[in-house]
């Protein structure tokens, strides 16, 4: 019987690269996505087309309301998504696009799914990005959450170890895109933008777009998605 794995899938290049990596293993894949604000709703739409390319056993989309977490440009309609011209302008501290406890919330849901379906492995596409300082993307965070997961679940207490896999954790965005291209990821079906237009065009100026464009440029490859 195949081992089961839960993959947190956002529709962006990082989680899609992880999906590609896991698809080349013997895991039975259970994808988990979240619809938490209008600014990420396009991501969820993209995922529907994306997973058709993969042998995903089940895809769950969980609707959660993070708008009470004010102070983030991704959940607070009163805060504009910052725009930049190049990587030199990107902030060196934790950006306003940080969503309080987002990965902790997402991983907690994944932990529940793991127990329900009998899986022991969770995959997430976090990495120590060259241009952001999200606290819930660090190696020590993943290690700590894994320790908590094994203390707070029945399977963990019973000695059946739950493992949080972050295969991109020490990679730069440039390295992730390079890896994905080598594996054959179709990045035209992904989206990174924090502030896309209603018809699905990426803004090309938010932190995520700038980092993505820079990564493709460094790989001497044209980004296949459309920008404003």
From Swiss-Prot:
Its cofactor is Zn(2+). NCBIfam families: 7-cyano-7-deazaguanine synthase QueC (TIGR00364). Pfam families: QueC (PF06508). Gene3D superfamilies: HUPs. One of its GO terms (biological process) is queuosine biosynthetic process. The keyword Transmembrane does not apply. Keywords: ATP-binding, Ligase, Metal-binding, Nucleotide-binding, Queuosine biosynthesis, Zinc. Catalyzes the ATP-dependent conversion of 7-carboxy-7-deazaguanine (CDG) to 7-cyano-7-deazaguanine (preQ(0)). Its EC number is 6.3.4.20. ATP binds at residues 9-19. It comes from the Bacteria. This is 7-cyano-7-deazaguanine synthase. The keyword Transport does not apply. The gene is queC. GO terms for molecular function: ATP binding; ligase activity, forming carbon-nitrogen bonds; zinc ion binding. Binds 1 zinc ion per subunit. PANTHER family: 7-CYANO-7-DEAZAGUANINE SYNTHASE. SUPFAM superfamilies: Adenine nucleotide alpha hydrolases-like (SSF52402). Pathway: Purine metabolism; 7-cyano-7-deazaguanine biosynthesis. Zn(2+) binds at residues 193, 203, 206, 209. It catalyses: 7-carboxy-7-deazaguanine + NH4(+) + ATP = 7-cyano-7-deazaguanine + ADP + phosphate + H2O + H(+). Belongs to the QueC family.
């Amino acid at each position: 019987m195949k081992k089961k794995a839960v993959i947190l899938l956002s529709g962006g290049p990082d989680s899609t690269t992880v999906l590609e990596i896991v698809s080349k293993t013997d895991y039975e894949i259970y994808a988990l996505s979240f619809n938490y604000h209008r600014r990420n709703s396009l991501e969820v739409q993209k995922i529907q087309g994306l997973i058709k390319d993969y042998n995903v056993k089940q895809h769950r989309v969980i609707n959660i309301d993070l708008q009470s977490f004010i102070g983030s440009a991704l959940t607070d309609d009163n805060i504009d998504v910052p725009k930049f011209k190049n990587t030199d302008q990107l902030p060196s501290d934790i950006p306003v696009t940080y969503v309080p406890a987002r990965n902790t919330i997402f991983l907690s849901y994944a932990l529940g799914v793991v127990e329900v379906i009998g899986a022991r492995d969770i995959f997430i596409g976090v990495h120590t990005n060259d241009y952001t300082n999200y606290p819930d993307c660090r190696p020590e965070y993943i290690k700590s959450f894994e320790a908590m997961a094994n203390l707070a679940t029945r399977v963990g207490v019973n000695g059946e170890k739950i493992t949080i896999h972050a295969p991109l954790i020490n990679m730069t965005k440039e390295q992730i895109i390079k890896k994905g291209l080598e594996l054959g990821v179709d990045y035209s079906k992904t989206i990174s933008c924090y502030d896309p237009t209603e018809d699905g065009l990426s803004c090309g100026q938010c932190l995520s777009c700038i980092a993505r464009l820079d990564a493709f440029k460094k790989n001497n490859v044209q980004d296949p998605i459309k920008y404003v």
